[in-house]
UniProtKB/Swiss-Prot annotation:
CDD domains in alphabetical order: AAA, Bac_DnaA_C
Keywords: ATP-binding, Cytoplasm, DNA replication, DNA-binding, Lipid-binding, Nucleotide-binding
GO terms, biological process: DNA replication initiation; regulation of DNA replication
UniProt similarity note: Belongs to the DnaA family.
UniProt protein name: Chromosomal replication initiator protein DnaA
Annotated spans, Domain II: 74-142
Gene name in the database record: dnaA
Species per Swiss-Prot/TrEMBL record: Desulfotalea psychrophila (strain LSv54 / DSM 12343)
SUPFAM superfamilies documented for this protein: P-loop containing nucleoside triphosphate hydrolases, TrpR-like
Record's subcellular location: Cytoplasm
Region Domain IV, binds dsDNA, annotated ranges: 361-479
């Protein structure tokens, strides 16, 4: 009996692997285990009831279609938690004909909480785990990284407000209001926190109607709705069938006026209805280029918080966590050296540790300070003696612009561009805060943020400027 259902499920999984994305398959299909097939009913076991509720809500039709496609005798699919599997298998090997009992939630209505009860099964097939009816809301949820949870997020002074706000909005607390906007550079935790909110809701409030998309996905879905004359369905999905909306990378909507108008309408409707909204971008609303004024105003109406690069204490904890995850053993001096010298984003820290692990394995598994210094020098290239004033002096010499001019209010391109490059390099290669870098040039922190964004964008579009910035980066590493 087990071999038959296992074979059918394996074939069905092969079909699902072809029809679903790799992430969706690995996160939501692969964990399901086939445990029984009898009288046309296949029983699949999932990790817990929240997982099962999400699978039933989003992928039940695909699962049923794939199973009936490989075995026409299959007429129904039922689910149970994996913790009930040993009991089921034990029961199946007994000679007793007495009907087994399984705990199932008692459901009085969709609006009342379920309570555990013990019910006798009328047949040898365990009753399907029942939950309060999950609304069929056509949820849009990006594939979630399994480790991007609140428990795995390393909290420090640079991100504590953003983390607290995300916990509050996921718990539907009134402390942050209905709309939360998070901005930061790449690799500092925006996506991690957004995934964490989604994970929390799936685990604790599986009936919450949640849509989690990137701004580009929202735009593509809107265009599809326009082309297929289905905008009514699109509007209903996001304005009516939604309790919380998560949208990443708002800055990618630059110049997309129609999408901005549509998303602004969605935000307005949701906020007025008391629903929750979480937006992320690489800059604060007022600093986003190519964004409509009304849309900018709507995004600015709630709590706005930024995530800065982690401080040395947080970096030390990140090093310890990432090293443990790769089964590497660092002593206190090694951890301290990495935390002091790898000053970029979390991805940069992880990259350095991965490189250390790879080189150690190639060299027989031995890790010492010489190896760590070599990796930091080649992969990261940071120098703890660097300061924004040293970089300012280097830029002054390279562009033949006086320090006084770099600190002046002049907007001449011959002065403003070197100043912006200097701020960009200071942010990249030093541990100084935005305010400290700003003081070096007699500016405030917002000017530094703007300069970093300008150089990042220009260097990506202008190959000549990109090469110049890379050359200057090499010179900074040699200071």
């Amino acid at each position: 009996m087990f071999s038959g259902v296992v074979m059918a499920w394996q074939k069905a999984q092969g079909c699902l692997k072809e029809s679903l994305s790799k992430d969706v398959y690995s996160l939501w299909i692969a964990p399901l285990e086939s445990v029984r097939q009898e009288n046309g009913v296949v029983s699949l076991a999932g990790p817990d009831r929240y997982f099962i509720a999400f699978v039933k809500q989003n992928y039940l039709k695909e699962i049923e279609r794939s199973l009936t496609g490989v075995d026409s005798s299959i007429t129904d699919v039922r689910f149970l938690e994996k913790k009930a599997v040993p009991q089921l298998r034990s029961m199946m090997h007994r000679t007793s004909t007495s009907a087994p009992t399984f705990p199932v939630p008692s459901v009085s209505s969709a609006s009342t909480a379920s309570t555990a009860s013990t019910a006798s099964s009328a047949s040898s097939v365990p009753r399907q785990l029942r939950l309060p009816s999950v609304p069929k809301n056509n949820a849009s949820i990006r594939a979630l990284h399994p480790r991007y949870t609140f428990d795995e997020f390393m909290v420090g002074q640079s991100n504590i407000l953003a983390e607290s706000a995300c916990r509050a909005i996921s718990a539907d607390a009134d402390t942050v209001g209905p709309c939360l906007y998070i901005n930061s550079g790449t690799g500092l935790g925006k996506s991690h926190l957004t995934h964490a909110v989604a994970h929390h809701l799936l685990s604790n409030s599986p009936m919450t109607r949640m849509h989690y998309v990137t701004a580009q996905q929202f735009s593509a879905e809107m265009v599809h709705g326009i082309k297929n004359n289905s905008m009514d369905m699109f509007k209903k999905k996001y304005q009516e069938d939604c309790d919380i909306l998560l949208v990443e990378d708002i800055h990618t909507l630059k110049g997309k006026k129609k999408t901005q108008e549509e998303l602004n309408e969605v935000l307005d409707t949701l906020v007025k209805s008391g629903k929750r909204v979480l937006l992320t971008a690489n800059a604060a609303p007022r600093e986003l280029a190519g964004i409509d004024g009304e849309f900018r105003s709507r995004m600015s109406a709630g709590l706005i918080t930024s995530i800065q690069a982690p401080d040395i204490k947080t970096r030390s904890r990140i090093v310890e966590r990432k090293a443990a995850g790769q089964r590497l053993s660092f002593d206190e001096d090694m951890t301290s050296y990495l935390a002091q010298n790898v000053r970029g984003d979390v991805r940069q820290i992880e990259s350095a540790i991965t490189a250390i692990g790879a080189r150690a394995r190639l060299m027989g598994g031995y890790i010492d300070m010489n190896l760590i210094r070599e990796v930091v020098g080649s992969v990261v290239g940071c120098n703890q003696s660097l300061s924004s004033s040293l970089i300012r002096d280097l830029i002054s010499a390279q562009f033949q612009v006086s320090v006084e001019d770099l600190q002046s209010r002049s907007r001449k391109k011959s002065i403003s561009l070197p100043r912006q490059i200097a701020m960009y390099l200071s942010r990249k290669f030093t541990e100084e805060s935005l305010a400290e870098i700003g003081r070096t040039y007699k500016r405030d922190h917002s000017t530094v943020i703007h300069s970093v964004k300008v150089i990042t964008d220009k260097a990506r579009r202008d190959m000549s400027l990109g090469a110049q910035v890379n050359l200057l980066s090499d010179k900074v590493k040699q200071i």
